A protein has these predicted regions:
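N-terminal beta-alpha lobe that positions the nucleotide/phosphoryl donor
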Residues: 1-119, 208-233, 249-251, 255, ...
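Conserved divalent-metal-coordinating catalytic cores
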Residues: 13-17, 90, 130-286
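Structured beta-strand/loop patches that form or line metal/cofactor-binding pockets in enzymes
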Residues: 110, 115-138
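General beta-strand structural signal in soluble alpha/beta enzymes
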Residues: 53-56, 77, 119-120, 133, ...
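A general secondary-structure junction signal
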Residues: 56-58, 122, 242-244
Length: 286
């Protein structure tokens, strides 16, 4: 398979053909016995049918400035060990999804230099969630924190499905400016009887027009942001959730470049993939 990828070079059509083969091999195959056993034991310790998020975490040792945000799959509100194991395989397969392969090809990254870990986290049924940057992504002011927030699970904000509230604060948690987004929908847990993991529902007009976060929540988020940034010693991009007044840090990654904010980077990637012609092949969005 490595030979096939190497032979494909930067030819997108050949790369996608090879990637499709690998995805099929992953999905049709079995996880290594020791991996499956470890997952089963840990999941059992969490509790029977506990809800978890199965998240992809891609990296490349030789590409410290690379951003792979949003290129691989994450699954929310997954219940039951069989479904968890299936989602783990889907995460591994998503390293070779057309979106990810096209992104790496466009950026000039070696397809064989990337790796992927899968993280299984107990779900937080967030009432509010979003992302924050411990540096202003527009002005690069390191004394400011940018928070984007909306209702429900964080997928709404991360995927760009909603126009979230935008808060600009100092490192002490003092609000400097706020722009209220429309927040027309939110993503919540799916009904027990349904087959989907999550569902999208409307947000009331009143809640759309209100600020999502209050002063106390903003201060708490900023305090956690500073703590995470101090721990890693560099500006961070953080996904968070709030439930019953408590802040939960769901993901933290270094801001690999301050040339543009990640939302702009992801927009450019999406635009590239949309406009790419792959010799008649219909692109599959894994």
């Amino acid at each position: 398979f490595r030979k096939e990828l190497t032979a494909a070079g930067t030819d997108e059509a050949k790369l996608l053909e090879a990637a499709a083969k690998l995805r099929n091999l992953i999905m049709q195959g079995n996880l290594p016995e020791e991996v499956e056993t470890a997952i089963r034991k840990k999941y059992q310790k969490l509790g029977e049918h506990i809800r978890v998020a199965v998240r992809s975490s891609a990296t490349a040792e030789d590409l410290p400035d690379a951003s792979f945000a949003g290129q691989q799959e994450t699954y929310l509100n997954v219940r039951g060990i069989d479904k968890v194991l299936a989602r783990v395989k889907s995460c591994y397969a998503s390293l070779w999804g057309n979106r990810a392969v096209c992104y790496r090809c466009n950026q000039g990254y070696d397809q064989l230099s990337v790796a992927l870990a899968v993280v299984i986290q107990e779900m937080v049924e967030s009432e509010k969630s979003g992302v924050l940057f411990t540096v202003n992504p527009i002005t690069h002011n390191t004394e400011e924190i940018q928070i984007n927030a909306s209702y429900g699970l964080g997928e709404s904000v991360v995927s760009g499905r909603v126009t979230a509230d935008s808060y600009l604060c100092d490192k002490k948690g003092n609000l400097k400016s706020c722009q209220i987004g429309s927040k027309q929908t939110q993503i919540i847990y799916a009904d027990e009887a349904g087959s989907a993991d999550t569902r999208e529902v409307p947000v009331s007009t009143k809640m759309q027009q209100e600020r999502c976060l209050n002063e106390q929540e903003i201060a708490a988020l900023c305090a956690e942001a500073v703590r995470v940034e101090t721990h890693y010693g560099q500006p961070m991009d953080i996904e968070w959730g709030i439930r019953n007044g408590s802040v939960y840090i769901l993901q933290a990654r270094a801001i690999t470049t301050l040339k543009m904010d990640h939302s702009e980077e992801n927009r450019q990637v999406a635009e590239y993939i949309k406009n790419s012609t792959i010799k008649g092949k219909e692109k599959e969005n894994m």
